[in-house]
Design a protein with these regions (language model features):
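Extended oligomerization regions of viral-like shell subunits
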Residues: 1-123, 134
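Protruding loop/beta-arch "assembly-hinge" segments enriched in small, turn-prone residues
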Residues: 118-154
């Protein structure tokens, strides 16, 4: 959904939310909004955005949740870059925000490679180094578990 270079508001967010199939969009507790830092700053200006002092202790540093919009938790991703007006990261200005609405049960996390542990002796410090690695996979259940609000003015 194109926000037309305007600040996010509840109408635009609901339009993006209801682009999801009704079996996904009907339960806000199963949804989450993932936003970039600039879009989060605009969310703070929305009267409909419930911050934790209003919404209670459900969002903590452990979950990363910073508030609610329309009953769905909001998460800020430092890895989500600003985009061009078309919602894609390009070589140009990249000065627009995005808000991604996801149906949380519609995503799978699995192992590409199980946990591998190695112990190495470091003679120069007379100590041991323990290293554990894992490769995870992340995939959607189907092609309709996410909806994007792009071209958000930040």
């Amino acid at each position: 959904v194109d926000a037309s270079n305007a600040a996010p508001d509840l109408t635009k967010l609901r339009t993006a939310r209801f682009k999801l199939p009704s079996r996904y969009s009907a339960r806000p507790s199963d949804l989450a909004w993932i936003v970039d830092g600039g879009t989060y700053a605009k969310f703070l200006g929305m009267t409909e955005f419930l911050t934790m002092e209003k919404a209670g202790p459900l969002a903590t540093a452990q979950t990363g949740q910073i508030g609610y919009v329309d009953g769905a938790p909001v998460l800020v991703s430092a890895e989500m870059a600003l985009t061009e007006a078309d919602g894609k990261v390009g070589g140009g200005t990249n000065d627009r925000g995005t808000a991604l609405c996801v149906y949380r049960p519609g995503w799978f996390v699995g192992y590409r490679r199980r946990i591998a542990v190695s112990v190495d002796y470091l003679p120069y410090t007379d100590s041991y180094q323990l290293t554990a690695t894992v490769r995870l996979a992340f995939a959607p259940f189907d092609t309709s578990v996410a909806s994007l609000l792009y071209n958000v003015a930040v």
